[in-house]
Amino acid sequence: MKLYCLSGHPTLPCNVLKFKSTTIMLDCGLDMTSTLNFLPLPLVQSPRLSKLPGLVLKDGSTFLDKELKECSGHVFVDSVPEFCLPETELLDLSTVDVILISNYHCMMALPYITEYTGFTGTVYATEPTVQIGRLLMEELVNSIERVPKAQSASTWKNKEVQRLLPAPLKDAVEVSMWRKCYTMPEVNAALSKIQLVGYSQKIELFGAVQVTPLSSGYALGSSNWIIQSHYEKVSYVSGSSLLTTHPQPMDQASLKNSDVLILTGLTQIPTANPDGMVGEFCSNLAMTVRNGGNVLVPCYPSGVIYDLLECLYQYIDSAGLSNVPFYFISPVANSSLEFSQIFAEWLCHNKQTKVYLPEPPFPHAELIQTNKLKHYPSIHGDFSNDFKQPCVIFTGHPSLRFGDVVHFMELWGKSSLNTVIFTEPDFSYLDALAPYQPLAMKCVYCPIDTRLNFIQVSKLLKEVQPLHVVCPEQYTQPPPSQSHRTDLMIDCQPPPMSYRRAEVLTLPYKRRYEKIEIMPELADSLVPLEIKPGISLATVSAMLHTKDNKHVLQLPPKPPQPPTSKKRKRVSDDVPECKPLKPLLSGSIPVDQFVQTLEKHGFSDVKVEDTAKGHIVLLQEAETLIQIEEDSTHIICDNDEPLRVKLRDLVLKFLQKF
C-alpha cells in the first residue's frame, strides 16, 4: 500500500493511493497562493498600475523590467496569474483508475488532470460538489478571460534568473509547475467524466475495493471517503467540521476500525474561533456603514457567504442597517443562491425541516425578496444603475488579483471611511493587499474557517482509534510563527506518519487475508477430521478461478479422456492436470513413548537430548539421529534407505493423516 503526495498544500490536497491493484486519486486541489506574486487584473485601465516602475536588479540590469514591476517595496509579475499544479511527474497519471472528490474547493485542478495527463478513469463526487465546483471554475475562468493580457512573463522563471530576484519571488517554489487558467471547454470536458454519488452509497472498483462517501459536515455535499476491501479499511478525512452550520453533520461512527486514516484539510487558523470572527465581522461592518463608509468582502460565491448572509439577516434590524444595500456580484451569483435553496437533502436537519413548511432553508431568499440583498453578474449593466453608497459588497476573488474585487479596491482604497473585511482564510491578507499599497481604507481580518482544529482532531482520533494516521508534515509540528504552541499539532499514538510534496510513503499496513468463495459442490465433497476436541480440518483439492479480483475455489477438473479420433486437440481443450495430494500430518510425538517403541523394534542404546526447539533421539549403534521439533521431524542416517523408511513408519504411528 503506497501513498503518493502530489500537493504541498495541506488544505488543498492531491494524493494517490495504490491499494489492492487499484490506483485512486484523493482530491485534486489547486494551490492559488501563487497568484499573490502577480499584479491584479483591473477591469478598467488603472493609471496607478500602468505607471509602476520595472524591476532593476542589484547589478543595474533591466532585462526584466517588462515582466516584473515594483510596488511599495514588493516585486510582482506583470502577467496573467498562474496557479501551482499538483505534481505530474511523480507517477504516470494515465494509470489512475478513479478520482474521489471530497469538496468543491478540492476539485479546482480537475481539468488539468483529466485533460492533460491521459486520464481515462472515472471521477466520483456528490451532486452539490459538482454543481458548486462548476460555479467556482466558471467564475475563475470568467474573471481571468475578460481581462486579457497582451504579454506573458516567463524569463523570470529560469532558475539562474530566479535566484537573482528579491523575496518572495526568489523563494517561490515549484514555479515550473505554474500554469495559466484552463478554459470553459476544458471545464465541461472534465465535469463530463464525473459520476454522481450519494452519502453511504457503496461503489465497487473492479471487484477489488469498495469506496463509500460520508458526510464531512464542512460544506454542501462535502465528503469523507471509506476505501475498504474485505479485510482492510482506509479512511480519507478531508475538510471536515463538527460545528453546526448549514451542511449535514459529520458522520464519525463510520470511521471506526480503520487500519489507516489519511487526514488532511484541517483549519488554517487554529487560534481563531469562527463564532467570534462572525461577531467581529458584523460589528466592524456596522461601524463602517454608520460612519458613512463602504464595506468590501472578498469571498467565494459559495460556502461561508451563506452563513454570513444568515447572520446579517438576524443582525440588520437590531444594528440599524435596514436601509443599507447589500450587493453580491459574481457571474455565478444567481446560480449559487438558487442552488443553496434546492439542495435540501444535503442540509442539516433544521434547514431540511423548513423545506416542508414550506419555507426557504436560507434566509437570504427573504433578503432578496425585500430588496435588501441584490445580486448581479458583474459591475456593468443593472448594477451601475442601482449602485448606492454607503453599501456592503460581496464579490471575488479573495486573492484580490482578479474579479470585480479589483475594481472596488482601486475605487475605495483611497478613503479611510471604507473597510475591506477578509473572511476567507486561504490567502495572507497582507500579501493580498501588497499591490494596493499605500492604502488608506481600513483592513479587518476576520478569517472564518469551520474545519477541524487540533483539539477536535485529538478527540476524534481517540474515538475512532485508527491503527495508523497519515497527514501532511505541517500538522506534525507547531506553526513556524508559534513554535512554542505544541498544542497546535496532531498528538496521537503511535505518532502520525507525515508526508510532503513529491514524496512516496509506503504505508505500514500489509494485507494479511484474501476472501475466497468455495463452490457448494466442492464444500459437499470435503471430509473434516477432528484433530483436537472442537477442531476439525479437511484438505481441499481444487482449482482457483480468479476474475475481476474475485476468487472462487471450484472442483478440480476430471482427468482428460483419451482421444477417440486422430483430430488435433485445440489448445482451449487443455485441462490443467490435477496431481494427487500427499496426505497432511498433524499431532505431536510423545518422546518417552517413541523411545519405548524404538526399543520394542530392536533399537538399543537410545539416548535423548533436549534442544531449544524440541528433542534429538540418538540411535548410537545405527549412527542415526532423529530431530523432533514442534512443526517438523527429520531422520538423518547415512545411505541406509531401509532404515530410514522403517523409522519413518514408526514416527507416522503417532501422527494423524488427513
UniProtKB/Swiss-Prot annotation:
GO terms for cellular component: cytoplasm; INTAC complex; integrator complex; nucleus. It comes from the Eukaryota. Keywords: Cytoplasm, Nucleus. One of its GO terms (biological process) is RNA polymerase II transcription initiation surveillance. Residues 550-574 are annotated as: Disordered. It is found in: Nucleus; Cytoplasm. A motif (Nuclear localization signal) lies at residues 566-570. InterPro entries: Beta_Casp (IPR022712), Integrator_9su (IPR027074), IntS9-like_C (IPR048660), Metallo-B-lactamas (IPR001279), RibonucZ/Hydroxyglut_hydro (IPR036866). Component of the integrator complex, a multiprotein complex that terminates RNA polymerase II (Pol II) transcription in the promoter-proximal region of genes. Component of the Integrator complex, composed of core subunits INTS1, INTS2, INTS3, INTS4, INTS5, INTS6, INTS7, INTS8, INTS9/RC74, INTS10, INTS11/CPSF3L, INTS12, INTS13, INTS14 and INTS15. The core complex associates with protein phosphatase 2A subunits PPP2CA and PPP2R1A, to form the Integrator-PP2A (INTAC) complex. INTS9 is part of the RNA endonuclease subcomplex, composed of INTS4, INTS9, INTS11 and inositol hexakisphosphate (InsP6). Belongs to the metallo-beta-lactamase superfamily. RNA-metabolizing metallo-beta-lactamase-like family. INTS9 subfamily. Although strongly related to RNA-specific endonuclease proteins, it lacks the HXHXDH motif that binds zinc and participates in the catalytic center. Its function as endonuclease is therefore unsure. This is Integrator complex subunit 9. The gene is INTS9.
